[in-house]
């Protein structure tokens, strides 16, 4: 990141509320099929980021994804069912892929997901997160469902 022109003040940058279809995992009956659907969504997100970066240019610094873009909301599943099928592990492959996208495109990438915690088995949290341009997860805000 470049130094601000005026010390103590941020330079201008572009932010994007990325509009992309959410392919919810509610039709999937198990984690394996839900994971495949999430992987396909991650590929679409990557393609959209590539296009946005080319269109907007290097001033694009912040991209915000749609709400629950990887899974959509639960549609009648119990808490344990949704936790098993759709909630992401904090160190799971979906977060690794999101971190890689932030790094590849040099943006702060913000979004939210359902997230598990090993200290609360069978439950999940609604988690909002931000990855920085180096791929580090720099912010997580969680709340109970």
Where are each of the predicted segments found?
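Hydrophobic structural segments
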Residues: 1-145
């Amino acid at each position: 990141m470049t130094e601000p022109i005026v010390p103590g003040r941020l330079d201008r940058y572009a932010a994007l509320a990325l509009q992309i279809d959410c392919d919810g995992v509610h039709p999937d009956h198990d984690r394996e099929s839900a994971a495949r659907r999430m992987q396909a969504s991650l590929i679409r997100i990557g393609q959209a980021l590539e296009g946005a970066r080319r269109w907007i240019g290097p001033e694009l610094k912040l991209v915000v994804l749609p709400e629950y873009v990887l899974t959509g909301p639960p549609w009648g599943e119990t808490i344990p069912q949704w936790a098993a099928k759709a909630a992401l592990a904090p160190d799971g492959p979906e977060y690794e892929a999101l971190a890689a996208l932030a790094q590849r495109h040099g943006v702060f990438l913000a979004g939210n997901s359902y997230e598990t915690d090993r200290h609360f088995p069978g439950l999940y949290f609604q988690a909002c997160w931000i990855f920085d341009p180096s791929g580090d997860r720099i912010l997580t805000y969680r709340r109970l469902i």
